A protein has these predicted regions:
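Boundary/entry segment of secreted carbohydrate-active catalytic domains
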Residues: 1-40, 44, 167, 171
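C-terminal beta-strand-rich structural cap/linker in extracellular carbohydrate-active enzymes
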Residues: 452-474
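Conserved, mostly hydrophobic/aromatic
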Residues: 41, 69, 112, 123, ...
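Substrate-binding cleft and catalytic face of glycoside hydrolase catalytic domains
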Residues: 36-56, 60-194
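Conserved beta-strand positions
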Residues: 14-16, 43, 125, 131, ...
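Carbohydrate-binding surface patches
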Residues: 391-437, 466
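Noncatalytic carbohydrate-binding groove/subsite architecture in carbohydrate-active enzymes
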Residues: 141-311, 315, 322
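Aromatic/acidic polysaccharide-binding cleft in carbohydrate-active enzymes
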Residues: 272-371, 389-392
Length: 474
């Protein structure tokens, strides 16, 4: 294949969730993404949703997506090969598995892409296939075979669309060289090189590891003699992965639950037993773990929210500076209105990352992270590049220049610090060269930051909370 250029410009996107239209009516979500400043919407579609019986197509969910798109929007559809009748592992949801009949799968993909021709920019074949058992019930060679069929069908139906490799997740990026997860993706990258245009990476864990993660997946491709542009199909934080003490306690309870003998026909699943045990001893848990629980103390909930707001900014800026031009935040909102289950482990791990929530049947409740996302999107509107600037004698200082043609200069600045306690440290004053007439600064929460000028220099306080420094209107 010829070299492939990265998608032009910079776009911030949001994932709707993992089950759009599966457990309820497909409600509007693209206008909500647009209202936050997002210009890319990612959504999941399942084979069984679209083709519930052989040869019978139901376009309810697909048309609901298309009806919400404006010409200026970009759309990314993750197509999961989950079907009660067409896949090796009969399932309406997850894990996805290989098609029983490759030709039938190709026809399904062709019909789907033809229905959306010219409206969907990115088509993705399943999600995090190395997360076997949970998201993909198959092998790496089977994924490559399905990816190859998928890519051929997409390109025949809509030559202008791009194919995205199933996301390379934290299971790969956090594992050591030679791990099963890395071996899985290495096989896919080696043998599936002609079947995708963009490499999707999922950026969880420590935000400051993002440049290394992006370079790691690029190196994975270069080892096999090629390279594709990298996009971030998911990111957000904080997650439990960032707190070793919290993760150790969680793993201890998980191990106890999964190794305890089941008693009786109504024995509770081990994941729910784990959650029940955590709530039973909540008062003695480390605060870095308690803050992920439902109804945790308000001061811990507020601290988690502040960390989330900071990381919405830092994760994006670090990814963009690494040459990623599309970032997609996980996630917009709960899957359905009114669902609460504090023993749901996935909710514990990722539920608080949602930007919005329901008020009755409407997605109208904005969390603090949604405001942080909208604020960042406003600052980055029209941006076409981000680069890190050298900070002499301050290795803990992160300074980034944003290119915004026609909008004036913008820098984003913060200091490294402990993810949980860093906000307790006092800010430090820094100087920046600033040859512009005006100088204004606000932080990731929208609060004004005092700026003083000394000739061509400006001084302002910095901390773990990112600061936006700009010359004109924000």
């Amino acid at each position: 294949m010829d070299p492939i250029a990265a998608p032009a410009g910079i776009r911030l996107g949001i994932v709707r969730g993992i089950s759009y239209g599966m457990f309820g009516k497909p409600d509007p979500f693209v206008p909500q993404i647009r209202a936050l400043g997002g210009s890319l919407a990612r959504v999941y579609v399942y084979w069984g949703q679209v083709e519930p019986e052989p040869g019978r197509y139901d376009w309810t969910v697909v048309d609901a997506i298309l009806d919400q798109l404006d010409p200026a929007d970009e759309a990314w559809v993750t197509v999961c090969s989950s079907s009660p009748w067409a896949t090796r592992n009969p399932s309406a949801f997850l894990p996805s598995s290989p098609a029983r009949d490759t030709a039938r799968y190709a026809r399904f993909v062709s019909h789907l892409v033809t229905r959306c021709r010219g409206r969907v920019d990115y088509w993705q074949c399943n999600n995090e296939p190395s997360n076997t058992g949970l998201l993909w019930d198959g092998t790496a060679p089977e994924y490559v075979e399905q990816l190859t069929t998928f890519a051929r069908a997409v390109r025949d139906a809509d030559p202008g669309a791009r194919i995205v490799l199933g996301g390379c997740g934290y299971d790969v990026l956090s594992s050591p060289p030679g791990s099963e997860e890395r071996a899985f993706f290495d096989h896919v990258v080696e043998h599936g090189r002609d079947a995708f245009d963009l490499f999707s990476v999922h950026l969880y864990g420590d935000p400051h590891d993002i440049p290394g993660h992006v370079e790691s997946v690029r190196a994975m491709m270069r080892r096999h003699g090629y390279e594709r542009p990298v996009v971030a199909g998911e990111y957000n934080g904080p997650t439990l992965f960032e707190f070793p003490e919290a993760q150790a306690v969680f793993q201890q309870e998980m191990t106890a639950a999964f190794t305890s003998p089941a008693t009786g026909a109504q024995a509770e699943p081990p994941d729910r037993s784990t959650m029940r045990a955590l709530y039973a001893r909540e008062a003695e848990l480390p605060d870095s773990l308690r803050m992920f629980l439902e109804d945790c103390p308000p001061e811990l909930a507020a601290r988690r929210d502040r960390i989330n707001c900071r990381q919405v900014v830092t994760r994006n800026v670090l990814a963009l500076a690494a040459g990623v031009t599309r970032t997609v935040c996980w996630n917009l909102a709960p899957e359905i209105p009114g669902y609460r289950d504090r023993l749901n482990m996935m909710g514990f791990l990722f539920g608080k990352l949602a930007l919005l929530d329901y008020d009755g049947p409407e997605l109208t409740v904005r969390h603090a992270s949604a405001d942080a996302f909208a604020r960042l999107a406003g600052h980055l509107d029209g941006a076409d590049g981000v680069r890190r600037l050298a900070a002499v004698d301050r290795p803990d200082l992160y300074v980034f220049a944003v290119s915004r043609p026609g909008r004036g200069p913008l820098e984003v600045v913060w200091t490294a610090g402990d993810v949980f306690t860093g906000e307790d440290e006092p800010p430090t004053q820094i100087e920046r060269p600033w040859p512009h007439m005006e100088a204004h600064a606000v932080d990731a929460f929208g609060a004004a930051v005092p700026v003083t000028r000394d000739g061509a220099l400006v001084r302002f306080p910095v901390s773990v909370t990112p600061v936006f420094l700009f010359a004109g209107p924000a």
